[in-house]
């Protein structure tokens, strides 16, 4: 079977439901693009968009993608299919005027059969209408268009259907592993066919084993063929050592190869139970988890493989060993990256079932679409060793009802039938699941915790109903709410049918659930970042607690303002333009680690050295808004020009017993650590601020901040060589650093980026959560001293020359080599 990338030479134009008339009148503007392509990121944001803050004020729309191609005569009589990994929201696929399919799930992969509609030896027109015009339809930034890759499949008379080679680790013993391999072989022939199915398993290019079976296939027959192997001295896959193998399954007719399917997989066992937690190859692993959305920051939703790999690599380097695909099936490139870096995956079905959260969301189609979506999801995930959990839903509104419990049971059972090797969960939110019980629960909470009047005699400074609900999910109120008997009643139906009990913002139940369900593992499927000390203590002290997933690991577009610090009286969740990002990730929109990330790494036990963070001095004396998702508005910087003599609030994060802080060599005293933190008030003086940790009286780590002196612009690319495939990408960080390597995070600079040569300037932007700058223009202002340019390779070899001009004066240049693409 031919399996090839089908991403090149597309055109896109904006539609409005009347594309034929617009084309006739010449009212369209077409652009040639290389997929994946997100059309939403190129739209102008407006305060009055129907999506509001949910998408960061980006509007949706209808987009018409077209591609002309020639179908060789040799394809005639063969199975010709097109695989679309993701088109948002609704996709209508036409070939030469024929409607091939309508797909309603913007996150689900789908396949169309093209053969009967092709013109062989002639020009063909493939048209995809990506309709994201029914708004609002999502609680976060979705992107629009064909934002994931497209593949072409051309099958011979006998072939291996996509995703039908399955490799299962049955047992791992001392020096061996038992594997079961199954393959579905399909005959499209009108006569009996005699073929050989040959299996080869390789590790790092060296064959480990080879086997074959001879088959006699009747016309049109589909057969499942099984192999069983014992692999000697296997290199096992684990988060710490993610060894991968390659399976090559060939269909041979004599010496002719009719088809070939290559599958990367890992040899590992998986078990989850209340006594031992998650075990990979018999070893217990606590899940250090990050919830992530699918966008790639300033790229929007375009799923470039290099962007997905970069994101997973950065999360792993920050101490995470697991991600949750929130709230939809993960893309293939993301799963591939997780396999390579040893990051475990909770793959998720949907944010809604049959009750809407937005007027035009997936709830409109869920009942008729969930089963094929699960089938495709499992087929996609099965051979990925990183995938360990299927999450059937997120904060489902009907979870506390009888009908919701029954839906949960059907979903979990379907996952188990299709994949008995993995486990199911549901990310349950108490506020959503409580349903009709919520009024009574809230009454009990308010009687237990009477409202405290604010300074003006009001309700705490004018907090609205949303803030009142949010307060139920944190602190003592949150624990009382979480453990309320009526909430236990509401959650019981879904909890009974899941393998793992998943809880969103219900920390008070993490221990209680073991009393109620002693044989079930429990997981914090979504939790507040600032609660990591308490959360991780519960995880470490309780075998049934298998891990914690923070919201969120990486900042993202949409849900704008959830974590933005308002010092002007503004309130979070108030849909304030031009807010664009949630601003609550451990890593910011560009992938820079924020102070909460280092605290988390210390709490995890992965970092011995202390870490220093300073509250933004320009906000001294000011009071900000606050939500449970927010940590502190601080930076790891000792460069605060114009604030000499003013008091800086300095946090030291450390796992040591005590720390000592030094300013320009003078001790500011030792302090015992409380919840991994010690806070100092320090008069700001430029120079050196150093923290030293002590345990048992001995130094066990130190960390130093220095004031930046005469910082100069630097350009740092994560890659200097790209393939000329139209999809490779380099991420260029633009910072201002002095001769000692100290970055100036304070001074703002206006940047202009220019590119010449064999590539495309795909995006330019900063991590500023509240900016009107576009990401598809070459200009940007730094935020916290940083900006980023994303360079995408073209389809011809050559060089890319990048020039960045700062403040209309200083220039820096960078060259990236574009090599011929590998076949």
What is each PLM-predicted segment?
Residues 119-121, 182-273, 685-686:
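Extended acidic/polar, glycine-enriched regions
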Residues 114, 227-236, 679-684, 778-795:
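Short, hydrophobic beta-strand segments
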Residues 193-198, 239-246, 647-649, 655-657, ...:
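Short flexible loop/turn segments that cap and initiate beta-strands
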Residues 176-216, 225, 648-666, 688-693, ...:
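Beta-strand-rich binding/interaction modules
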Residues 2-19, 36-39, 54-161, 204, ...:
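Accessory beta-strand-rich segments of carbohydrate-active enzymes
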Residues 4-5, 11-20, 152, 390, ...:
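Substrate-binding clefts and catalytic carboxylate motifs of secreted carbohydrate-active enzymes
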Residues 41-71, 75-84, 88-104, 157-166, ...:
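Active-site-adjacent substrate/metal-binding segments within catalytic domains
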Residues 260-265, 697-709, 811-819:
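Edge beta-strands of extracellular beta-sandwich domains
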């Amino acid at each position: 079977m031919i399996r090839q990338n089908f991403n090149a030479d597309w055109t896109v134009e904006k539609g409005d439901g009347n594309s034929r008339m617009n084309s006739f009148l010449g009212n369209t503007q077409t652009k040639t693009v290389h997929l994946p392509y997100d059309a939403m990121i190129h739209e102008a944001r407006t305060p009055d968009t129907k999506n509001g803050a949910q998408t960061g004020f980006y509007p949706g729309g209808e987009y018409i993608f077209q591609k002309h191609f020639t179908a060789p005569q040799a394809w005639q009589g063969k199975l010709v299919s097109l695989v679309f990994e993701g088109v948002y929201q609704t996709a209508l696929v036409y070939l030469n005027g024929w409607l091939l399919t309508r797909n309603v799930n913007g996150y689900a992969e789908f396949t169309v059969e093209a053969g009967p509609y092709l013109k062989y030896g002639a020009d063909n027109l493939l048209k995809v209408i990506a309709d994201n015009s029914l708004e609002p339809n999502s609680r976060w930034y979705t992107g629009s268009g064909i934002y994931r890759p497209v593949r072409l499949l051309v099958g011979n008379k006998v072939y291996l259907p996509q995703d039908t080679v399955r490799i299962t680790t049955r047992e791992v013993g001392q020096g061996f592993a038992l594997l079961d391999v199954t393959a579905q072989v399909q005959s499209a022939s009108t006569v009996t066919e005699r073929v050989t199915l040959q299996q080869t398993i390789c590790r790092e290019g060296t064959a480990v084993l080879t086997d074959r079976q001879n088959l006699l296939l009747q016309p049109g027959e589909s057969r499942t063929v099984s192999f069983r192997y014992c692999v000697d001295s296997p290199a096992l896959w684990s988060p710490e050592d993610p060894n991968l193998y390659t399976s090559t399954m060939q269909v041979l007719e004599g010496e002719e190869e009719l088809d070939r399917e290559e599958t990367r997989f890992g040899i590992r066992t998986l078990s989850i139970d209340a006594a031992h937690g998650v075990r990979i190859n018999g070893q217990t692993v606590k899940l250090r988890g990050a919830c992530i959305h699918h966008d790639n920051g300033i790229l929007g939703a375009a799923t470039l493989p290099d962007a997905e790999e970069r994101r997973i690599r950065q999360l792993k380097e920050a101490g995470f060993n697991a991600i949750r695909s929130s709230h939809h099936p993960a893309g293939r490139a993301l799963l591939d990256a997780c396999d390579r870096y040893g990051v475990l995956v909770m793959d998720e079905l949907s944010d809604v079932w049959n009750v809407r959260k937005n007027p035009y969301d997936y709830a409109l189609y869920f009942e008729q679409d969930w089963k094929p979506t699960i089938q495709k999801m499992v087929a996609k995930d099965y051979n990925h060793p990183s995938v360990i959990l299927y999450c059937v839903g997120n904060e489902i509104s009907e979870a506390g009802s009888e009908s919701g419990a029954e839906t949960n049971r059907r979903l979990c059972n379907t996952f188990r039938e299709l994949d008995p090797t993995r486990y199911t969960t549901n990310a349950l939110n108490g506020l959503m699941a409580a349903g009709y019980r919520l009024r009574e629960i809230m009454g009990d909470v308010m009687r237990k915790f009477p409202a405290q009047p604010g300074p003006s005699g009001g309700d705490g400074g004018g907090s609205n109903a949303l803030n009142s609900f949010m307060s139920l999910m944190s602190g003592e109120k949150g624990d009382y709410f979480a453990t309320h008997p009526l909430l236990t009643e509401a959650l019981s139906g879904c909890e009974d049918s899941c393998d793992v009990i998943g809880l969103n913002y219900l920390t008070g139940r993490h221990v209680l659930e073991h009393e109620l369900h002693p044989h079930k593992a429990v997981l914090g499927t979504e939790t507040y970042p600032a609660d990591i000390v308490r959360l991780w203590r519960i995880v470490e002290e309780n075998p049934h607690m298998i891990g914690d997933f923070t919201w969120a690991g990486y900042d993202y577009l949409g849900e704008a303002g959830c974590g933005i610090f308002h010092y002007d009286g503004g309130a979070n969740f108030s849909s304030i333009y031009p807010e664009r990002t949630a601003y609550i990730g451990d890593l910011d929109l560009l992938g820079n680690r924020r102070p909460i990330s280092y605290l988390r790494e210390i709490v995890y036990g992965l970092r011995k050295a202390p870490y220093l963070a300073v509250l933004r001095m320009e906000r001294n004396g000011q009071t900000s808004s606050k939500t449970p998702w927010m940590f502190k508005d601080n930076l790891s910087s000792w460069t605060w020009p114009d604030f000499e003599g003013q008091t800086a609030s300095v946090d030291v994060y450390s796992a040591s017993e005590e720390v000592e802080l030094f300013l320009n060599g003078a001790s500011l005293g030792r302090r015992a650590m409380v919840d991994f933190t010690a806070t100092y008030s320090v008069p700001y003086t430029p120079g050196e601020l150093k923290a030293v940790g002590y345990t048992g009286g001995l130094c066990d780590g130190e960390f130093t901040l220095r004031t930046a002196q005469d910082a100069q612009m630097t350009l740092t690319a994560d890659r200097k060589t790209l393939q000329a495939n139209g999809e490779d990408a380099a991420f260029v960080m633009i910072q201002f650093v002095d001769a000692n390597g100290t970055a100036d995070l304070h001074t703002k600079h206006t940047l202009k980026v220019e590119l010449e040569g064999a590539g495309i300037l795909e995006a330019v932007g900063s991590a500023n959560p509240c900016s009107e700058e576009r990401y598809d223009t070459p200009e940007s202002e730094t935020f916290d001293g940083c900006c980023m340019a994303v360079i995408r390779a073209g389809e011809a070899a050559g060089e890319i020359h990048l020039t960045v001009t700062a403040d209309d004066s200083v220039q820096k240049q960078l060259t990236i080599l574009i090599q011929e693409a590998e076949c």
